[in-house]
Regions:
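Exposed, low-structure sequence patches enriched in small/polar residues
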Residues: 1-391
């Protein structure tokens, strides 16, 4: 038996001219149920054997409340503390006492119980009240994501004499995902308060090996403009975060990225170089034409051929990536990957004639790793590229 729930909603608004807002909601929930039937000859009919459910869960989300926090260590500590609150909130038997291994937790719902860790993780990193937030991840509602664009900045009276085009961009995208879950084969629906011998926790109906929360401002702010004399400028600042909660080894992998990009371009029209096919031609002619003027020696000079465009491009970017691995209850924060990366590139393109295009370029890249086991890397390259078109 298969079940699939899909939601894909989009709303586009234009509050005023050239200002567009796009809001989206997404959800994809899949459940596949499988069981075997067997007649054992006892006369009791068919027996239901090994019922199994597998599936996935994916929704658009909103975790912006904690994205800009500077102290990620205190946020993680809050996540660990919130587990005790969710342990007490879980539905339990009437005479339930304290957990034998974790006195601060309710019976059957210890600090490493899946039904305790996952809702505490979602509430903490979403900035929700742990006393009122949801207990079941599959009942979480999708949240809006958005994209904002304004393309009318150059039409303002103060700017229309300088700019020929301009836009401002802002966008937010976030996902909450369970890539795969499956039935716990040891779960007994007729004995829901049966505990595991090793941890004294109740068995969960399903096992969720991994929960992922991603979000990004792409960009947080982006600006593009072009002047009347063909100067182009772009600015982008983006923030990304990825949180992966692993329920197999009780580890949280947090990836944070920030990137700043600045670009500059200029198209210089009618540039004439003393080579190629755009220099003046001198010829001797007995009779000058209308577009030729004889000089003192009787030679005629043909008007200079119109030059081609010279395109200049400069790009500068700085990116900061850091990945931390944290293990629950071990007070361990280990940077495993990451680097600060500086990139600079510039290029000049010029079409000498209809057959030959010349390009000069220089690229610089500097990587400073965040872990001591790696070494800084610097690369630089430059050169001239000649492109020939055979006709």
């Amino acid at each position: 038996r298969n079940y699939n729930q899909t939601l894909d909603a989009r709303l586009t608004l234009e509050p005023f001219s050239e200002f567009n807002i796009e809001i989206s909601l997404n959800k994809n929930y899949t459940r596949n149920y499988l069981e075997f039937f067997k007649n054992d000859g006892s006369g009791a009919g068919l027996k239901h054997l090994t019922p199994t459910e597998v599936g996935s869960f994916n929704i658009s989300y909103l975790g912006i409340n904690t994205l800009f926090g500077k102290n990620v260590d205190s946020l993680y500590a809050q996540f660990e503390r919130n587990r005790a609150i969710f342990s007490e909130r879980q539905p339990n038997k009437p005479d339930a006492g304290n957990h034998p291994n974790d006195p601060g937790y309710a019976e059957g719902f210890g600090r490493k119980n899946q039904n305790v860790i996952i809702p505490a993780f979602i509430a903490t990193y979403t900035g929700l009240d742990p006393q009122n937030s949801g207990l079941d991840i599959f009942k979480t509602s999708p949240r809006p994501n958005w994209q904002l664009t304004y393309n009318g900045l150059h039409k303002l009276p103060i700017l229309n004499k300088v700019l020929s085009g301009a836009s401002i961009r802002h966008g937010y995208n976030s996902k909450l995902m369970v890539n795969q879950y499956n039935t716990d084969v040891f779960y007994d629906p007729d004995s829901v308060y049966r505990t595991k011998a090793l941890t004294a926790d109740y068995y969960s109906r399903i096992e969720i090996p991994n929960v992922v929360m991603t979000e990004s401002f792409s960009p947080l702010i982006g600006i593009d403009f072009k002047t009347l004399n063909d100067l182009q400028f772009n600015f982008d600042y983006s923030i990304q975060r990825s949180l992966s909660l692993n329920m197999i080894d009780y580890q949280l992998i947090e990836q944070n990225s920030k990137e700043l990009t600045i670009g500059f371009g200029w198209r210089i029209k009618n540039v004439v170089f003393p080579f190629g096919n755009n220099k003046p031609q001198r010829t001797r002619a007995p009779r000058p034409t209308d577009d030729q003027t004889p000089d003192a020696r009787g030679r005629t000079t043909t008007a200079a051929k119109k030059g081609n465009d010279l395109n200049l491009k400069f790009d500068l970017s700085f990116r900061d990536d850091l990945t931390n691995n944290r293990v629950l209850d071990q007070d361990q924060n280990v940077p495993t990957r990451g680097a600060k990366t500086l990139r600079f590139s510039n290029a000049a393109d010029y079409e000498l004639n209809d057959r030959v295009t010349l390009r000069l370029f220089f690229d610089y890249n500097r990587i400073i790793p965040a872990v001591q086991e790696s070494f800084p890397i610097t690369t630089a390259k430059g050169g001239i590229t000649v492109r020939l078109a055979l006709k």
